[in-house]
UniProtKB/Swiss-Prot annotation:
One of its GO terms (molecular function) is xenobiotic transmembrane transporter activity. The chain crosses the membrane at residues 11-31, 53-73, 93-113, 127-147, 160-180, 188-208, 243-263, 276-296, 314-334, 357-377, 387-407, 418-438. GO terms for cellular component: plasma membrane. This is Multidrug resistance protein MdtK. The lineage of its organism: Bacteria, Pseudomonadati, Pseudomonadota, Gammaproteobacteria, Enterobacterales. The keyword Electron transport does not apply.
Amino acid sequence: MQKYISEARQLLALAIPVILAQIAQTAMGFVDTVMAGGYSATDMAAVAIGTSIWLPAILFGHGLLLALTPVIAQLNGSGRRERIAHQVRQGFWLAGCVSVLIMFVLWNAGYIIRSMHNIDPALADKAVGYLRALLWGAPGYLFFQVARNQCEGLAKTKPGMVIGFLGLLVNIPVNYIFIYGHFGMPELGGVGCGVATAAVYWVMFIAMASYVKRARSMRDIRNERGFSKPDTAVMKRLVQLGLPIALALFFEVTLFAVVALLVSPLGIVDVAGHQIALNFSSLMFVLPMSLAAAVTIRVGYRLGQGSTLDAQTAARTGLGVGVCMAVITAIFTVTLREPIALLYNDNPEVVTLAAQLMLLAAVYQISDSIQVIGSGILRGYKDTRSIFFITFTAYWVLGLPSGYILALTDLVVDRMGPAGFWMGFIIGLTSAAIMMMLRMRYLQRQSSAIILQRAAR
């Protein structure tokens, strides 16, 4: 029992800074929306539309680079720290290549926006302008993630937290300058949010790069040679590990976007209630997601040390802590669902529906915690392909069709409306949790030689 308590302490020490960093990142999006809304409703809507396209694109790149964390953790655990700098250099090359792709997609996103049904031309122009300003921040964001993944792979999660809040503090005044046109800058409205956020991402990267260069704990792996030429073998391996994670993130984000589109014809009350419950659930999701990042680090490090038993201990402890967190957040959600809904909207019908949906959200929080931590465990074992197949099957083959049938048809029961889609979420997330656990058990039952061979690739 003592080893599990010790492991839990180490996991929480890693996870808490990640949680706070994620809160800072979420707060940046909140600040953009509120400040754009203070300028005009049209600008706020433009930022919301632009963000709905930006997020899937940038999360694809973010997911691709998550492969660095278990690679660096494993090298650190095995004492091969001299190889880390080369992996990081290749991570920067990969980030640069993906940035070009993302920037191309975002530059041409106007075709998607203008094809939206009955969208106002002025709103479409502002959304396109916002994206074309924001896309210049894509390289800065992804370069920041490379440096952050280097730190987190070495079990240094506090720098990401500190620089995340630095970015938030810089974002507010820079937003104000570009939205309203102060200090000689043009008055850009919602487009100014894109300019400000792009600039902030570069500030965050420069700050993180400066920390990495000066940190005493990284002197032995400092990147003295600068940028070496691309190593196709290393980049190919990073893509093989990262692409399934990137696709899983992409399909997860697009799932919720598709459900939002399917709910939209049901009426304003249904849309508002669904959005409130979804937004609150997303905030609660920060906890298991951050714990999953910590579990990836610990499992990768233990495998690098050559101890499959300690890796199992880290995995089991992560799951135990995650379930305890989920039970607490579920009780919190059930107990305070109506006051929470009132914080978003005071319409009685909206509050009633949101409170009902939050009951369903409380049910799936345990499954959600297990599946996302299971994903973190599999990343630590470098078994990322299974993450994609499990996620795609659970969400798109089981969850979404089930939700559609329950919400919009009479095939099984009378039409349930938004609650049907939330039942679909429960089915999908529970299926994902079961499949993640089965895959984890399959991997852990393999011989130590096979597990360590895979981890060393």
